[in-house]
Amino acid sequence: MYYPEPIARLIESFSKLPGIGQKTATRLAFYTIGMEDQDVNEFAKNLLSAKRDLRFCSICGNLTESDPCAICTDPTRDRTTILVVEESKDVLAMEKIREYRGLYHVLHGTISPMNGISPDEINVKSLITRLMDSEVKEVIIATNATSDGEATAMYLARMIKPAGIKVTRLARGLAVGSDIEYADEVTLSKAVENRLEI
């Protein structure tokens, strides 16, 4: 189908986003074209601002405006527990339940032998280093219930247990193959409460 070049470029840009196919990208492009100039400018400004102003915390790897992040510097957090997640959006999901008061570590992915992603390509080394110099007594592994999430959890458990640190996994109120990001707050709360030792 023929579209003027500016619309075609916009459709292509939207289609690069995860979960956005050609049809949705086309719908978003035409919606954006129909928006008021002020709203388009605000959208563009917010997008550029987020890209420019956010960075990864040098301690936990979470997205933040300041380094270290607000969670790592919060003196009221339980420093004896670290909850390990795949992505920053998982931290947000866990914070919503207001049950967990420890620290976090964001891996930025999972080990995936099928996709050629090794432990060196995710944020594992800094976790191990962090554990060696800390008062951490428990690491809760909260990777997604997928084959890659399970492989990552087992690898982390093998790396951490020799240090004498308790390693637990979120309980299975989460369906196999599901992402933490999409779990409801009650399910997440119960998964943390009933976590299992690995």
Curated annotation (Swiss-Prot):
Superkingdom of the organism of origin: Bacteria
Gene3D superfamilies per record: 3.30.60.80, 3.40.1360.10, 6.10.250.240, RecR Domain 1
Zinc finger (C4-type) in chain: 57-72
Domain Toprim residue range list: 80-175
One Pfam family of this chain: Toprim_4
Keywords: DNA damage, DNA recombination, DNA repair, Metal-binding, Zinc, Zinc-finger
GO biological process: DNA recombination; DNA repair
Molecular functions (GO terms): DNA binding; zinc ion binding
SUPFAM superfamilies reported for this sequence: Recombination protein RecR (SSF111304)
Family statement drawn from the similarity comment of this UniProt entry: Belongs to the RecR family.
PANTHER family: RECOMBINATION PROTEIN RECR
Function as written in the Swiss-Prot or TrEMBL entry: May play a role in DNA repair. It seems to be involved in an RecBC-independent recombinational process of DNA repair. It may act with RecF and RecO.
Protein name: Recombination protein RecR
Gene source species: Lactococcus lactis subsp. cremoris (strain MG1363)
